[in-house]
């Protein structure tokens, strides 16, 4: 990573010339670096990652969602160097800073689920994303190993028994949603996979709940607004991924995999 950061100034300068960018302040961290830029008087974002696979997968998903207004637009790319040029979103306030209503999130989820993904090369299955997340949690060592083991088994069973071909954002939470023109919600920073799109509902139904009754009400309310969403599957994903979510309520400890709701089970 140190060598990648050392090479960034030259790479940014090269891309700025190629794409006609006036480069402004930088931000981001973890797996990417993001630069606010101007092109032809409009704000655009230059996103760089040291892992070309991450950039390739993100670009693939953004192209698939290109006809929706609820996902940031992809303007250009150089996947060889892990570079994406993304459209600006104005005002661009992160949803976590402004608060949100379930009905608005439901409209975002409906848009994300409206795309039929039949492109090649194929994105990785959701089970791979789950394995990555639990491997990361294991390495960090901040959660109970038995809880992580049960959560991993439950999540992989959820992936195995659910839809295999839905386009999943994979990292959809209020930090990765911006407010666009007219209050429209715009998703950014996908870590996409193919599988059960109900996976993307978890953060929206867990946040702030204090007991299982409140969780079930919120899940039922969201499922009523999103065609094709299974309340039972969303509950299953909440339990299966709870060990990965900081501050998840204790009542969401993963249940044994054999008790998970089957794909398509009706809400109760």
List the predicted regions and their residue ranges.
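An alpha-helical support segment within catalytic cores of ATP-dependent transferases
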Residues: 4-12, 117-170, 180-181, 223
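A glycine-centered beta->alpha junction motif in the catalytic cores
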Residues: 51, 68, 80-99, 114-118, ...
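Short strand-connecting beta-turns/loops that link adjacent beta-strands
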Residues: 39-42, 79-81, 181-183, 239
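Active-site acidic catalytic loop and adjacent metal/ATP-binding pocket
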Residues: 24-38, 74, 155-199
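Active-site Asp-x-Gly
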Residues: 179-224, 231
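A conserved alpha-helical element in kinase catalytic cores
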Residues: 9, 42-85, 89-112
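ATP-binding glycine-rich phosphate-binding loop
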Residues: 4-39
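Helical subdomain adjoining the active site within ATP-dependent kinase catalytic cores
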Residues: 220-225, 233, 243-268
């Amino acid at each position: 990573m140190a060598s990648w950061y050392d090479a960034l100034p030259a790479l940014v300068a090269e891309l700025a010339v190629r794409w006609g960018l006036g480069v402004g302040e930088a931000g981001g961290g973890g797996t990417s670096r993001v630069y606010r830029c101007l092109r032809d008087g409009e704000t655009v974002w230059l996103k760089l990652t040291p892992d070309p696979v991450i950039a390739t997968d993100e670009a693939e998903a953004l192209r698939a969602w290109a006809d929706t207004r609820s996902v940031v637009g992809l303007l250009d790319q150089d996947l060889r160097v892990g570079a994406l040029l993304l459209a600006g979103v104005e005002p661009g306030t992160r949803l976590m800073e402004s608060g949100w209503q379930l009905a608005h999130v439901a409209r975002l989820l409906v848009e994300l689920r409206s795309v039929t993904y039949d492109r090649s090369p194929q994105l990785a299955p959701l089970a791979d994303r789950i394995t990555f997340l639990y491997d990361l949690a294991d390495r960090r060592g901040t959660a109970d190993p038995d809880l992580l083991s049960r959560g991993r088994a439950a999540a992989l069973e959820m992936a195995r028994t659910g839809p295999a071909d839905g386009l999943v954002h994979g990292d959809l939470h209020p930090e990765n949603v911006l407010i666009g023109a007219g209050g429209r919600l715009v998703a950014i920073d996908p870590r996409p996979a193919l599988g059960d799109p109900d996976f993307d509902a978890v953060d929206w139904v867990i946040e702030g709940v204090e007991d299982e009754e409140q969780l079930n009400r919120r899940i039922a309310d969201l499922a009523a607004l999103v065609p094709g969403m299974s309340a039972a599957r969303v509950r299953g994903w909440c339990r299966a991924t709870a060990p990965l979510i900081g501050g998840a309520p204790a009542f969401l400890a993963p249940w044994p995999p054999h008790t998970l709701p089957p794909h398509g089970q009706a809400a109760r």
